[in-house]
């Protein structure tokens, strides 16, 4: 296995790449210090080889934190797997400092094993597997205090040294913003010969403070030439379990996701309400695919649109 960058790695594009004291002993030192190869990441070829049997990669993005990217990722994965039992799905949690997928997918306490083909992802269902840095920590309360280069090295290992096998779709749960993790994963997965192999779904809540950052994320994808499948409006309303009436917890003062999608020419995949039953199930890692309510009906519709976009 290739070693991750040193903790104080100056980065591939730094003038000190391969020359700084932190570079001593790094297996990539010679490549980084070569001016003819400095912009050529030595891990790219390893990622390409490892991901050759992964048909599609789907980034779950949002410029704003707390809008439910991780929850939406887990819900989409479960519904896609249930409605497409002959297809294989994977989830990669690249929120390095705040991994949530082990809890959401009911895999807390699981560990990753090494095989001759690399790390084996944790099996969730017969056709779903998961990889997260949460499986590599001694405790769920351990803090990860890493700089960008070390995060990037971890992401590269997840992409190149995990035995993903044959996957029809790999969903990537991302942190907020457009930071090191996003730039790293795009640089490794973007394939100019097959631009449709890497796509994105945006998650937002109805209020303008969220939409403002999602617009930035959409523009990030456009600059990187990443096709956007559509936008999911999460927490669009709250339906009372007693009276059945709906209320807007986050009022859409500027028209919400629908208005933004119309303005920016992006499909609106659907809206998901706040749902107490779903929230409790996610906290305990339960499978929610057998639930029958407004939220699960909306999820079915959203998943159908996502599958159709890959056809």
UniProtKB/Swiss-Prot annotation:
Phosphoprotein as UniProt keyword? no
- Residues that, per the record, bind [4Fe-4S] cluster 2: 240, 243
> Could you say which residues bind [4Fe-4S] cluster 1 here?
9, 23, 26, 32
Q: Where does ATP bind?
A: 63-70
> Which Pfam families does the entry mention?
ParA
Q: How is the cofactor bound?
A: Binds 4 [4Fe-4S] clusters per heterotetramer. Contains two stable clusters in the N-termini of Nubp1 and two labile, bridging clusters between subunits of the Nubp1-Nubp2 heterotetramer.
Q: Which GO terms describe its cellular component?
A: cytosol
Q: Is Repeat a UniProt keyword of this protein?
A: no
Question: What transmembrane ranges does the database entry give?
Answer: none
Cofactor(s) the record lists: [4Fe-4S] cluster
Per its UniProt entry, which superkingdom is the organism in? Eukaryota
Q: List the GO molecular function terms.
A: 4 iron, 4 sulfur cluster binding; ATP binding; ATP-dependent FeS chaperone activity; iron-sulfur cluster binding; metal ion binding
Which biological process terms from the Gene Ontology are attached to this UniProt entry? iron-sulfur cluster assembly
Keyword set, alphabetical order: 4Fe-4S, ATP-binding, Cytoplasm, Iron, Iron-sulfur, Metal-binding, Nucleotide-binding
User: Where in or outside the cell is it found?
Assistant: Cytoplasm
What InterPro entries does its record include?
A: Mrp/NBP35_ATP-bd, NUBP1/Nbp35, P-loop_NTPase, YlxH/NBP35
Q: How does it assemble?
A: Heterotetramer of 2 Nubp1 and 2 Nubp2 chains.
What family classification does the UniProt entry report for this protein?
Belongs to the Mrp/NBP35 ATP-binding proteins family. NUBP1/NBP35 subfamily.
Please explain the role this protein plays, according to its UniProt record.
Component of the cytosolic iron-sulfur (Fe/S) protein assembly (CIA) machinery. Required for maturation of extramitochondrial Fe-S proteins. The Nubp1-Nubp2 heterotetramer forms a Fe-S scaffold complex, mediating the de novo assembly of an Fe-S cluster and its transfer to target apoproteins.
Q: What is this protein called?
A: Cytosolic Fe-S cluster assembly factor Nubp1 homolog
